Amino acid sequence: MRRRFLFALAATWLAAPTLQAANGQSPFVLGIAPHTSARVILEMYQPLRRYLEAALQRPVEVRTAPDFTEFARRALNDEYDLAVTTGHQARLFQSDAGYLPLLTYRADFKAVALVDRKGPYQDIAALRGSTVLGLSPTSLVTLWGQRWLRLQNLGDVTIRYVSAADSVSRLVLAGDASLAFTSLANYQKLPPEQREQLRILAESEPMAGRVYVLNRRWVARQKSIEQSLWSFAASPAGLAYLTQNQLDGYRRLRPRELEAMDPYAAEVRQVVLGR
């Protein structure tokens, strides 16, 4: 309950000035998958929020969710106007709720398995009987990690889920888990002194990373909204955002890039909808 209150409080605090200036106009909701803490997300997407607000001439709010599963539920319930999430959820939102894929980042998205560089889990066999960490059961890095574990035939590994991506590495270094699954981007953003204590035991092939998908109710303005995103990427604020987060700019989705995520999307559907 307290976490939900903090999410709402943070979103309200950041959006309040724009709502006051909007003369009661309903906000355009930018939904960001919880790839890191709510505080970091709300700060990270302020440049895009401000740019879209000016382009759309209406208030824009940044919202996230406590975990990836709840984020998917909210998106499928049409709570977001523009959602930014990893490719498997983007595919689910497209196929099940009619969201319109717009673009993604140029930088590769990869999942990684992290261990303590000086810990006892320096090879795959050592993981047998241990506890590993994922985010929520529907995050792409966790789904990849669970498939990777099955391929290793370890059998009795326990998977524990945590809600904050920036805490999994600390838990591994504290000895609370043998290994943690996270994204390569989140690993690269760790403080240098923390990153140096970790080692990548396994790394995925590139997958469809964070994808921008537009709610179908905005189909009439799809072209203008997409153009606003491209213009943001070329602006000083956009260039700073893309550089700071090592995203290399935007790109169009490749043919069938999202369709390739169908197996992962099906796993999310099973968890969220029970089918």
Task: Go through each PLM region and give its residues.
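Ligand-binding cleft/hinge of the Venus flytrap
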Residues: P47-L56, L103-T104, V141-V162, Q188-R195
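Periplasmic-binding protein-like
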Residues: S26-H35, I41, A107-V115, E193-A233, ...
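A structural signal for short loop-to-beta-strand junctions that line the ligand-binding cleft
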Residues: A97-R106, L201
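A ligand-binding cleft/hinge motif common to bilobed small-molecule-binding domains
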Residues: V84-D96, L171-L198, A202
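N-terminal export leaders
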Residues: R2-F7
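Flexible hinge/capping segments at coil-to-helix
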Residues: V115-V132
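Extracytoplasmic small-molecule ligand-binding "clamshell" domains
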Residues: N23-H88
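Short helix-initiation/N-cap motifs at beta->coil->alpha
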Residues: V62-R73, T86, T158-R170, P206-A208
